[in-house]
Amino acid sequence: MSDAEVAALLDRLVAQFEGPYDFLRELVQNSLDAGSDRAEVALEVHPGEGEDPDAAVFELRVADAGCGMDEAILDGGLTRLFASSKADDRTMAGGFGIGFVSVFAWQPDAVVVHTGRAGEAWELTFFADRRFEKRALAEPWEGTTVTLLRRGRAQERAQIAEAVRDSLWRWCRFCRLELSFEDVAGGEGPELIQDAPAPPGALAVVDERGDGSVHVAFAVPPEAVMLRRGLVLAQGPAVDLLADLTPP
């Protein structure tokens, strides 16, 4: 494929995600799939270049303590956007490689990945045009940390922080790890992003089959929530999400 064809395909992959902050769900999925017991999301603001006092660089970081990646995984999965080691593993929630492309929906100026596994440690820097550079690190690294950097205006911080918080609560509130978000400049410390589905009531029906289950209960208005490993895949009116099951 030519560079232009690859760029067009990458743009289509980015466009498949509903919103610019959906990448947070994809990165939390990767943390789950890496076996991490926690994922820490943080937003920091740094002064921008030049003399403009309102210029800023936003640093949005997702760090986990999972199994990390070695060079073989990086070359065979993360940097080959069409390769996914998860394709045949139904216990995996994400689409490694393809899912990682979602970070570009936030339109970062750069994305930096630090990761380590089996004595290896690596740093990858992805640029806005999807080029990347890879270098080995001398010091060991635990898990994987993905850092997005984007230029903007300092007054955007509160809006970005709220969008991050909303996305995490929307998609990841039931996830099976300890998830936190810290707006560093806000000064309130880390916020735990955690909730639990309501327990089955007297009029609820639970159907468990294999590693999946269906919970049916009364709700006003009727709503459907689709989860996989605690991550919200879709949520909305039952008539839309379960069209094949609802009467005409």
Positions of PLM-derived features:
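Bergerat-fold GHKL ATPase/HATPase_c domain
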Residues: 1-40, 44-55, 71-79
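Broad, structure-driven detector of short, well-ordered beta-strand segments within folded domains
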Residues: 41-43, 118-128, 202-206, 212-219
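Short beta-strand element(s) in the Bergerat
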Residues: 55-60, 144
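Acidic ATP/Mg2+-coordinating residue in the GHKL
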Residues: 64
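Glycine-rich G1-box
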Residues: 67-68
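GHKL-type ATPase core
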Residues: 88-191
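GHKL/Histidine-kinase-like ATPase module
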Residues: 173-248
